[in-house]
């Protein structure tokens, strides 16, 4: 039976991992380093695998030190996409099953991140999006973008890489533009209506400045309007400028000889000779939400519908159909893109595909003597809820996972990374640090006996084991 791992499932996995660091009774995670032994070819290390021999045994033997990972060391991240001129960005669509595999957002040079809502019918992006407005940002190339958030300077330093950028959703007002965007988001809004077919023979449109206003339901169109009776019946009259901007009314009667259009209902704000208008096909957004409206923009050369402008985004839609009608015209189709359930910009992590989590745990010099600074390491990993030798849960800031041998009767000089062999037990280990009185070892195989002689495999130095201390 076909199945799919949904983006919501992937997001849940990331949420659970990240939340583990900040819960009331948090999972204790430690970042460890290990592996002083050289690989067969250090320039081409082996691919890690999940064998029991590695995850249960070898990594522990090779471990040098570990440091507790705090909640402040963890961030959601998304693939880094730098805005680049000449790129076709994928526009957001609630029906696009491969959205998160596409380039549908971009970060600009000042670390603002924008989501592409409309790509100008498949055009190339040539104008850099800018600004932090909560409203849709339209650029000169016809693209429409949604400002999502800005990567802070601190997060740039800690989590920004060539491949990933950090992303977060705010839970409290931090005074940022992102918080304003989150608060302005509208559940189930329709921000974009995309024309999929422009139709044909749309001659019943007109733009101009009103010649006269009769009353609240009658207007006289400009001199270039049609002389054909009823031509604009069923179309939408929309005020585009001047007095009474932004009103939409259906034309129910048109007299060609006088150019008088009768509107289905009264305008709420009086119109006058400064009012500019557009008469175009009527657009109705039918769905389970309320309040969304849109108007059509015409291609006056081909007499087709070129695009739609959403004049009110509405709310609470989960599905919607676009119905377009005008007297004597046909063939136009369009799709309404419904925002995520909480609205564009409400949850940047979920909306941009924050399925990955980055851990950045800084090792500060020798961490009070718990970490070596005189050797290298070849392994790095995470420990979940490690236990101390006593059986209690580890909760300290750092731990030293090496064993220190106190020596006497030293002859010669031990060197780091060499194998040291026991003369009695045939045990062996690898030296992390060495001086004239002690050696610190890891990757121990077998138990050394007190008093036995150990020999460096490379230096041939010898000494007797006087004491041994774990950690």
PLM ranges: what are they?
Residues 1-113, 117-471:
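Feature for peripheral, non-core segments
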């Amino acid at each position: 039976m076909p199945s799919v791992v949904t983006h919501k499932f992937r997001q849940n996995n990331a949420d659970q991992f990240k939340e583990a660091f900040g819960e009331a009774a948090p999972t204790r995670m430690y970042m460890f380093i290990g592996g002083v032994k050289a690989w067969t070819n250090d320039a081409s290390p082996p691919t890690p695998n999940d064998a029991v021999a590695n995850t249960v045994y070898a990594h522990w033997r090779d471990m040098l030190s570990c440091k507790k990972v705090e909640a402040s060391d963890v961030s959601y991240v998304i693939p880094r996409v730098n805005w680049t001129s000449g790129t076709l960005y994928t526009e957001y669509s609630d029906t696009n099953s491969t959205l998160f595999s596409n380039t549908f957002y971009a970060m600009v040079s000042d670390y603002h991140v924008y989501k592409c809502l409309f790509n100008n019918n498949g055009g190339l992006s040539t104008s850099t999006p800018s600004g932090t407005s909560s409203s849709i940002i339209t650029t000169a190339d016809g693209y429409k973008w949604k400002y999502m958030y800005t990567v802070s300077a601190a997060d740039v330093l800690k989590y920004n890489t060539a491949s990933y950028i950090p992303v977060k959703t705010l839970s409290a007002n931090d005074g940022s533009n992102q918080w304003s965007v989150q608060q302005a988001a509208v559940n189930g809004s329709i921000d974009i209506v995309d024309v999929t077919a422009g139709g044909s023979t749309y001659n019943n449109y007109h733009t101009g400045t009103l010649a006269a206003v009769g009353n609240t339901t009658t207007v006289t169109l400009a001199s270039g309007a049609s002389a054909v009776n009823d031509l604009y019946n069923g179309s939408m009259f929309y005020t585009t400028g001047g007095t009474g901007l932004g009103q939409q009314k259906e034309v129910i009667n048109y007299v060609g000889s006088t150019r008088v259009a009768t509107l289905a209902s009264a305008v709420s704000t009086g119109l006058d000779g400064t009012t500019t208008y557009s008469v175009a096909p009527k657009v109705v957004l039918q769905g389970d939400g309320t309040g969304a409206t849109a108007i059509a923009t015409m291609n006056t050369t081909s007499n087709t519908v070129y695009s739609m402008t959403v004049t009110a985004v509405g709310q609470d839609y989960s599905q919607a159909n676009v119905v377009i009608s005008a007297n004597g015209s046909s063939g136009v189709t369009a799709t309404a893109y419904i925002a995520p359930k909480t609205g564009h910009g409400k949850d940047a992590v979920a909306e941009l595909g924050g399925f990955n989590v980055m851990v950045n745990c800084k090792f500060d010099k020798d961490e009070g003597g718990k970490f070596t600074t005189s050797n290298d390491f070849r392994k790095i990993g995470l420990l979940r809820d490690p236990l101390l030798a006593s059986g209690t849960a580890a909760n300290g800031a750092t731990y030293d996972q090496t064993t220190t041998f106190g020596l006497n009767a030293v002859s010669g000089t031990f060197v780091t990374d060499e194998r040291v062999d026991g003369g009695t037990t045939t045990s062996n280990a690898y030296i992390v640090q060495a001086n004239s009185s002690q050696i610190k070892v890891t990757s121990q195989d077998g138990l050394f006996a007190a008093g036995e002689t150990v020999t460096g495999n490379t230096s041939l130095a010898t000494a007797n084991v006087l004491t041994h201390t774990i950690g």
